């Protein structure tokens, strides 16, 4: 019965809007810093840990090791094998999840107050003494091999991996987090231990907690949970400048629709142009059916069901990317229309009406992100990694509201680069050939 109560709490509990969230920074007796939002109305806490570096810390000849390691952390620890770990987690009505991406290894925990001490013990065993049993390694390797095979048959994944390789080259961002079939198959238990040592250290740790816990309680919890982790991990990779030469790369693939990815240089978080660019992106490709690209590519011409763009800000690279799918006989026209929109907005800018609609949506939708302990914990730990101040949620909408039409149109002129707009197309697009 307790696990069903937990599920109900997890699903329905929500905190106040962003501006009302009171965030405190605490430092444990052992020196571990964390951001905390106390909410004692429900006996439930979400804890988020993030270790900077992620799969980018794979050794060059061990690609896929960090991803495999993260997947195996819940497959047994100390005296519990894979089944025993899962059963104990179920008994405690806890959620413990591990994940990895190019920039971080993430640990997400949701727990009831009455079971918090035991959940932390279970989590600590996974972080400090994972078993990495060979049968679990073989089983998870098999799952990863299946995913790699499915990616090789997916036009979306082929497009993503082709574009990443072109943008980032030999940098870790340029290859799949999973590795290749060959590199994944060759990984050993020693490789997993090395990956854990490289990534899960206190010098790259960010922590947030939201819920029924005080600062004093959180400090003691963190020292007990994380105090035995290594002080330092492997050096982080150097930043990389994505290569956007302009032009088109076509990857022939038998599919009725061409998958199209496109992009150009981006804008870093901390650059003064970021907020005008953020609003400009909303107008260009982030605003659903009212966005310029949706209007021109879908509504006027029926070339796609949907097209979108995003500012992509990673730890070590920034870009501005978009995607769509179009039938092979229309893909060439879709690429042309996107280029034309890019040229037009760069030259002529956007309208006051477009600006106001974008700002209204962006400021109105922001509080909706703060809809539960776990989501807030993820937001807070992401803010720390990205270097935002602790009061950012209270002032973020002010930054959006302050963006003027002059700001947006200046950034459009200076930042939009039609000459560097680069396309990757997977399919058999009629009338479209590789130029790169």
Language-model region placement:
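Sec-dependent N-terminal signal peptides
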Residues: 4-13
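N-terminal signal peptide c-region/cleavage motif recognized by signal peptidases
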Residues: 14-18
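N- or domain-start disorder-to-order transition segments that initiate the globular core
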Residues: 19-43
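M16/MPP (pitrilysin/insulinase) zinc-metallopeptidase core fold and M16-derived inactive scaffolds
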Residues: 21-23, 48-113, 153, 288-303
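Short, solvent-exposed loop/turn elements at domain surfaces
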Residues: 35-36, 43-46, 56-59, 270-271, ...
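His/Glu-based metal-binding/catalytic segments typifying zinc-dependent metallopeptidases
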Residues: 39, 48-50, 234-290
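Charge-rich, well-structured scaffold segments of protease-associated domains
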Residues: 84-233, 250, 276, 300-301, ...
């Amino acid at each position: 019965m307790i696990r069903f109560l937990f599920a109900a709490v997890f699903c329905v509990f929500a905190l106040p809007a962003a501006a009302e969230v009171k965030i405190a920074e605490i430092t444990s007796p052992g020196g571990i810093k964390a951001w905390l939002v106390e909410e004692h109305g429900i006996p439930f806490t979400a804890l988020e840990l993030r270790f900077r570096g992620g799969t980018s810390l794979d050794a060059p000849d061990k690609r896929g090791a960090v991803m495999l390691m993260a997947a195996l952390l819940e497959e047994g620890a100390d005296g519990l094998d894979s089944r025993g770990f899962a059963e104990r987690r179920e008994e405690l009505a806890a959620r413990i999840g591990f994940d990895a991406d190019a920039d971080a290894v993430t640990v997400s925990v949701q727990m009831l107050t009455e079971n918090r001490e035991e959940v932390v013990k279970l989590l600590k065993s996974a972080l400090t003494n994972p078993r990495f049993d060979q049968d679990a390694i073989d089983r998870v390797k098999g799952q990863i091999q299946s995913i790699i095979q499915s990616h090789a048959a997916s036009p979306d994944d082929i497009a993503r991996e082709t574009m990443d390789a072109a943008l980032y080259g030999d940098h870790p961002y340029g290859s799949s987090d999973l590795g290749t079939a060959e590199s994944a198959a060759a990984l050993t238990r020693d490789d997993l231990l090395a990956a854990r040592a490289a990534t899960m250290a206190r010098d790259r740790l960010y922590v947030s907690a939201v819920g029924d816990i005080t600062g004093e309680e959180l400090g003691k919890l963190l020292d007990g949970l994380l105090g035995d982790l290594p002080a330092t991990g492997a050096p982080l990779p150097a930043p990389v400048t994505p290569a956007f030469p302009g032009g088109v790369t076509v990857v022939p693939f038998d599919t009725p629709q061409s998958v199209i990815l496109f992009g150009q240089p981006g804008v870093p978080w901390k650059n003064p142009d970021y907020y005008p660019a953020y609003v400009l992106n909303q107008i260009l490709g982030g605003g659903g059916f009212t966005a310029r690209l949706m209007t021109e590519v879908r509504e006027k011409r029926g070339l796609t069901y949907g097209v979108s763009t995003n500012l992509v800000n990673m730890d070590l690279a920034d870009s501005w990317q978009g995607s769509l799918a179009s039938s092979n006989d229309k893909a060439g026209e879709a690429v042309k229309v996107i280029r034309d929109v890019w040229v037009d907005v760069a030259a002529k800018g956007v309208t006051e009406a477009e600006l106001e609609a974008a700002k209204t949506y962006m400021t109105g939708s922001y509080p909706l992100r703060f809809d539960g302990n776990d989501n807030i914990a993820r937001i807070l730990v992401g803010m720390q990694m990205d270097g935002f101040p602790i009061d950012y949620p209270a002032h973020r909408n002010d930054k959006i509201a302050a963006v003027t039409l002059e700001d947006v149109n200046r950034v459009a002129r200076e930042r939009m680069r039609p000459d560097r707009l680069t396309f990757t197309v997977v399919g058999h697009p009629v009338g479209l050939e590789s130029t790169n």
